[in-house]
Design a protein with these regions (language model features):
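Conserved alpha/beta-domain cores
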Residues: 1-301
Length: 301
């Protein structure tokens, strides 16, 4: 099976570099750059131009995924301030902000549909912080009404991973944000350096949540766009549990492609099973390394 290797980017100017480094498309385009550090929301035309630029960088038919505005109390916007929250990581962020400020999401979806029309390309559009099927339905119907053909969600909340067969019903694809998924699964704040041991995506519980998402996804393409995708050894584990697209910082693409090229799907499944059987992140990594091609040790050192 072909595994797509894509890039995470935060600005249209990052797209050509990502392509040069071997990205087959974009697995996560963070649209926040258009919204942060300004007093007013960006216009539809301004957004359309940025989205069209990214779509045109890659070949026709390439997977280019736009994440709708992922802001909130932890990434406050001057023009969409919902007030201070004691625990912003669990507050009105991502899709929850969009449901309060429908004007922002509707303008963004209109701009993405216009960019698709202008370029003749079909963007993948996904919403962050979706926790229930009702939220997935809300976003899907709004996006499709705006003219978006390929609609998805981020899987960052354990409830979505555990109930993927239901939550993913209204959408066409999903992308797992392993950074937030780890934070929520392990009840450990990503910003607390002292909790680094809990926050590694090698946690067997996190790998199990990724597997649960893939197991319930039916024929939908499941990708990973968290830091986990850029680790050549962990990439093999992710493919082994059912992930079919990996998106990472452009600088990590070569090493991940090298690791993938040395393993077939059956080998990846065996590596994943060994990691899942482990009781700790260290054990999971050691077990995976033992079964991987020896060349991978050089790639991850």
């Amino acid at each position: 099976e072909r595994i797509l290797v894509l890039a995470n980017i935060g600005n249209p100017s990052d797209a050509p570099t990502a392509k040069k480094k071997g990205a087959e498309g974009v697995g996560l385009f963070r649209t926040e750059f258009l919204f942060l550090d300004r007093q007013d929301a960006p216009t539809i035309d301004e957004q359309t131009e940025a989205y069209a630029t990214v779509l045109k960088t890659f070949d026709e038919g390439a997977k280019v995924v736009f994440r709708t505005l992922d802001a909130g109390a932890d990434k406050p916007l001057a023009f969409a301030n919902l007030g201070a929250e004691e625990n912003p990581a669990l507050g009105r962020r991502g899709l929850r902000l969009s449901q309060v400020r429908t004007d922002l999401i509707d303008a963004q979806l209109e701009a993405l549909a216009k960019a698709a029309e202008q370029t003749g390309r079909d963007p993948y559009v996904m919403a962050p912080m979706v926790a229930t099927k009702a939220e997935a339905e809300w976003f899907s119907s709004r996006a499709r009404a705006a003219g978006i053909k390929t609609v998805g969600i981020m899987v960052e909340v354990p409830s979505t991973a555990l109930r993927s067969s239901q939550v993913l019903e209204p959408v066409d694809f999903a992308s797992i944000g392993t950074n937030d998924l780890t934070q929520y699964a392990m009840a450990a704040d990503r910003l607390q350096g002292e909790l680094a041991e809990l926050l590694t995506p090698w946690q067997p519980a996190v790998i199990q949540l990724v597997k649960a998402t893939c197991d319930g996804a039916g024929d939908r393409l499941i990708g990973v766009c968290g830091e986990a995708a850029g680790d050549p050894l962990l990439a093999l584990v992710l493919v082994g549990v059912g992930v079919r697209s990996l998106s990472m910082a452009a600088g990590k693409i070569t090493a991940v492609k090298a690791a993938l090229s040395r393993h077939n799907l059956e080998q990846c499944r065996r590596i994943a099973d060994a990691a899942l059987a482990a009781c700790s992140p260290e054990e999971a990594r050691t077990a995976a390394l033992k079964l991987a091609d020896p060349s991978v040790e050089v790639l991850v050192s």
